[in-house]
């Protein structure tokens, strides 16, 4: 089963998504399969950081609305074969604990690490992600 790591901060702009992307890449380059799960709906950025924006067909919003199967929203990073991403919803949507747990249950045996890239601040997304995580990392300053 995957080790689930939540990445968070008290405010925006401190580098959460950068830390998430680089941590994911570091694990992936060591041959550990990694799934980045971006939870900052309406403000996604991991697709840009990983250079996969043009590959997004479905995102977390589509999973939540039932417009696609979860596996169809997974984007494999072309320069890092062990790194995959589910991009945040393009428009704000509530990501429930149930949704996160469903993804972990469905893909936990395929990925050694699942990294939950949370939105800034303390809110329901962080609370839901933290309930599902084994480890947490708080980014304090840029």
List PLM regions with ranges.
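Residue-level recognition of oxygen-bearing side chains
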Residues: 19, 69, 121
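Walker A/P-loop phosphate-binding motif and the immediately C-terminal alpha-helix
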Residues: 2-40
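P-loop/Walker-type NTP enzyme "switch/lid" segment
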Residues: 36-109
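Conserved catalytic-core segment of NTP-binding enzymes
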Residues: 108-109, 113-142
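Residues at the starts of beta-strands that form the adenosine-phosphate
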Residues: 33, 82, 134-135
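Flexible glycine-/small-residue-rich
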Residues: 9, 38, 87-90, 118, ...
